[in-house]
Curated annotation (Swiss-Prot):
This is 5-methyltetrahydropteroyltriglutamate--homocysteine methyltransferase. The gene is metE. Binds 1 zinc ion per subunit. Pathway: Amino-acid biosynthesis; L-methionine biosynthesis via de novo pathway; L-methionine from L-homocysteine (MetE route): step 1/1. The keyword Methyltransferase applies. GO terms for biological process: methionine biosynthetic process; methylation. PANTHER family: 5-METHYLTETRAHYDROPTEROYLTRIGLUTAMATE--HOMOCYSTEINE METHYLTRANSFERASE. Its cofactor is Zn(2+). Belongs to the vitamin-B12 independent methionine synthase family.
Length: 771
């Protein structure tokens, strides 16, 4: 008998009920009792949905008010001093203060904890803050309360914990530099393990038989001391009187396989979607008493599982393992939308190819039933439907476009190279553009006012004509241009009033994308995103931005910059196809964007920015796999940017905090100008560019757009002087960290006035020095 179980379920609700309740609570429109009631309703509904889909062992503890890592920080008492409530007891407001830097009755104006990507997903977690003298204690009982809830409903359950090694790995040491630089956070393990033991003992006392302990870092390159720590930790935790399933996901175990197989636990979950090659090896290495859970259904994408293919593996495993076989999605379904059945307006053919969280649970259950009762009528019907879907999708003319494939096949090496090297190009560009030293610009977007959003909503709902919508957006463009001219910026942007999202705006105009109404997934806290779905070969039927940018250029004699989203970012922030490699999809996107770049150039646009915000996010978890990814990601950017003349200047923008390990690839992109987020690091990130001797122009962000604070001119001058120590002054641009979409106009204008003043001050100082 194969057990159908699940590692985790989306917590936001099919209608984003959690998001709405959280935001109502933060605004004071919903009290804590009301918020907790929404949480209970969602948990009960989600457990029932999984049960109805055929899941036998339900996850408990996958729900979180904001983030599962943050919930663990509260449970273990990892609450930074600035958030500790005076009365000593952690509350929901404590949790939200840690996440948002805001609380209604405590903690003052404390800065929120750092947030970063959860491995290589688009989910973000709150980074635990450890101190050298960190103590751990059981401080938050939400998990135990949820266990009682589920038991009261009569469910068979499996509580979910983040394992002690992964939890420590995900955190950061905070405090005095002289202490944190010499202290290894792994030394905290012995202090943390007793609290884990206490949690496990308490779960056992509640009658829990199995607990799932997530250790996703087993899919990473681990130092030897961390590998050794795994054995020590789980030797101690084996004393707890309940069964433990260690769950790994997002990649293969590789050199950690032997370690994972021999840990003193009762079961192991492996991801066979990301790493199918590990199956035969783990089967041979797993001790005969252990359960093996196979992740055969993709928990991170939206495509239906090929049930015949998955069943072939499951049947083989059943022959070897018998009742020790469990089946599950590859990872938590947190990364999947909730329920495909809500999509009442989705193209029926494309819809037949998809599966969201509820449907993925059904697929897992079908596989388990197919092991136990292969002739079951429902099983046979499900397998027949799966075969029909796979065949229809493989043959669909909507997916496979001969013209796109012919164009891909015709790509030559020269298509990914500019005509001349940067040193030649930059002289031609400077002669054409006639910009001053320290040229000023912005990253692209200006404030999205309520009026802009209402106009776009009315247009999409058919309440505003195309003509009236165009007129409204043109008025916003005229306003943005006038403001920039008045401030004195050198290179202007049109402000992107017509764009709701930097990916969706372009995806809506490309063939090969489809969009959902309810395909929301959690990004962090109450923020949800609705990624577009790439279902077929990608192409651009017509220009996407040219009319808007041309109109903006007509409003000014100054240089207007075209604004596009790059192919890698388009791919990373979409649900990608599974039937062709990601690099093929990136090339298709690159060709579509290349056409837009060339059309912008033909329209007289002299500077074109191609944003690659997600370039680094695509890096595989294992460093040995980086080179392949970086090669095709760089090639995709160059392919979209290399169709223009030397005189046309190509910019790119990246907004993340680590460049050292990818600086060669960033240089290989060969953008004429790269703008980057540096203000919060006080320009320290530029050290990577100096050490590498980065050859092209750079625009280090001189102020943080994530804050409404307006920095003064002297502060920005200081940052630019610091930047000039790393980058030759003739190659420095002056710009904010990122786009200004989320800011208001008053602070935007005030900050840009000071930024332009800072650039002029540096020009004057440089002129005086030359004189």
């Amino acid at each position: 008998m194969a057990v159908a179980h699940n590692l985790g379920f989306p917590r936001i609700g099919a209608d984003r009920e959690l998001k709405k309740a959280l935001e109502a609570y933060w605004k004071g429109e919903l009290d804590e009792q009301g918020l907790r009631q929404v949480g209970r309703q969602l948990r009960a509904r989600h457990w029932q949905a999984q049960l109805d889909a055929g899941i036998e062992l339900l996850p408990v503890g996958d729900f979180a008010w904001y983030d599962q890592v943050l919930s663990h920080s509260l449970m273990f008492g990892v609450i930074p001093q600035r958030f500790r409530p005076a009365e000593g007891q952690a509350t929901l407001d404590t949790l939200f203060a840690m996440a948002r830097g805001v609380a209604r009755s405590c903690c003052g104006g404390a800065q929120a904890q750092e947030m970063t990507k959860w491995f290589d997903t688009n989910y973000h977690y709150l980074v635990p803050e450890f101190s050298v003298d960190q103590q751990f204690q059981l401080s938050w009982t939400q998990l135990f309360e949820e266990v009682e809830e589920a038991k009261a409903l009569g469910h068979a359950i499996k509580p979910v914990l983040i394992g002690p090694l992964s939890y420590l790995w995900l955190g950061k040491l905070k405090g005095e530099a002289d202490q944190t630089q010499t202290f290894d956070k792994l030394e905290l393990l012995d202090r943390l393990l007793p609290v884990y033991g206490e949690v496990l003992d308490r779960l056992a006392a509640q009658g829990v038989e199995w607990v799932q302990i997530d250790e996703p870092i087993l899919a990473l390159d681990l130092p030897q001391d961390w590998k050794n720590a795994f054995e020590r930790a789980y030797n101690l935790l084996q004393r707890a009187p309940l069964k433990k399933l260690v769950a790994t996901y997002f990649g293969g175990l590789e050199d950690n396989l032997g370690l994972a197989a021999t840990l003193p636990v009762d079961g192991l979950h492996i991801d066979l979607v990301r790493a199918p090659e590990q199956y035969p090896v783990i089967l041979d290495r797993l001790p005969a008493y252990k359960v093996l859970s196979l992740g055969l259904v993709n928990g991170r994408n939206v495509w239906r599982c090929d049930l015949d293919k998955a069943l072939e593996v499951a049947r083989h495993a059943a022959e070897r393992l018998g009742e020790r076989l469990w089946l599950a999605p590859s990872c938590s379904l947190l990364h999947s939308p909730v329920d495909l059945e809500r999509e009442d307006r989705l193209d029926e053919e494309v819809k037949s190819w998809l599966a969201f969280a509820v449907q993925k649970c059904s697929e897992v259950a079908t596989l388990a039933r197919a092991i136990d009762d292969p002739q079951d009528a429902e099983v046979q019907a499900a397998l027949a439907r799966s075969r029909a879907v796979q065949a229809a999708r493989a043959q669909s003319p909507r997916i496979h476009k001969p013209a796109v494939q012919a164009r891909l096949a015709a790509i030559e090496a020269k298509d990914s190279r500019r005509t001349s090297v940067f040193a030649t190009r930059i002289e031609l560009q400077r002669a054409r553009l006639q910009l001053p030293a320290f040229p000023t610009t912005t990253i692209g977007s200006f404030p999205q006012t309520p009026a802009i959003r209402l106009a776009r909503q009315a247009y999409k709902q058919g309440r505003l004509s195309l003509g009236d919508y165009t007129e409204a957006m043109q008025a916003e463009i005229r306003h943005a241009v006038a403001v920039q001219e008045q401030i004195g910026l050198d290179v202007l942007v049109h402000g992107e009033a017509e764009r709701n999202d930097m990916v969706e705006y372009f995806a809506e105009q490309l063939e090969g994308y489809v969009f959902t109404r309810f395909g929301w997934v959690q990004s962090y806290g109450s923020r949800c995103v609705k990624p577009a779905i790439i279902y077929g070969d990608l192409s651009r039927p017509r220009p996407m931005t040219v009319d808007w940018i041309r109109y903006a250029q007509q409003q000014t004699d100054r240089i207007m910059k075209g604004m596009l989203t790059g192919p890698v970012t388009m791919l990373m922030w979409s649900f990608a196809r599974e039937d062709v490699p990601r690099e093929v999809q990136a090339r298709q996107l690159a060709l579509a964007i290349r056409d837009e770049v060339c059309d912008l150039e033909a329209a007289g646009i002299r500077i074109i920015q191609i944003d690659e915000a997600a370039f680094r996010e695509g890096l595989p978890l294992r460093r040995e796999q980086w080179r392949h990814y970086l090669d095709w990601a760089v090639e995709a950017f160059r392919l979209c940017a290399s169709g223009v003349r030397d005189e046309t200047q190509i910019h790119t923008h990246m907004c993340y905090s680590e460049f050292n390990d990818v600086i060669e690839s960033i240089a290989a992109m060969d953008a004429d100008v790269i703008t980057i987020e540096t203000s919060r690091s006080q320009m320290e990130l530029l050290e990577a560019f100096r050490a590498f001797d980065y050859p092209n122009d750079i625009g280090p962000g001189v102020y943080d757009i994530h804050s409404p604070r307006v920095p003064d001119t002297a502060e920005m001058v200081q940052l630019l002087e610091k930047a000039a120590e790393c980058i030759p002054a003739e190659r420095l641009w002056v710009n904010p960290d990122c786009g200004l979409k989320t800011r208001g106009w008053p602070e935007t204008e005030a900050a840009l006035v000071n930024m332009v003043a800072a650039a002029r001050q540096l020009r004057a100082a440089r002129s005086a020095k030359v004189a």
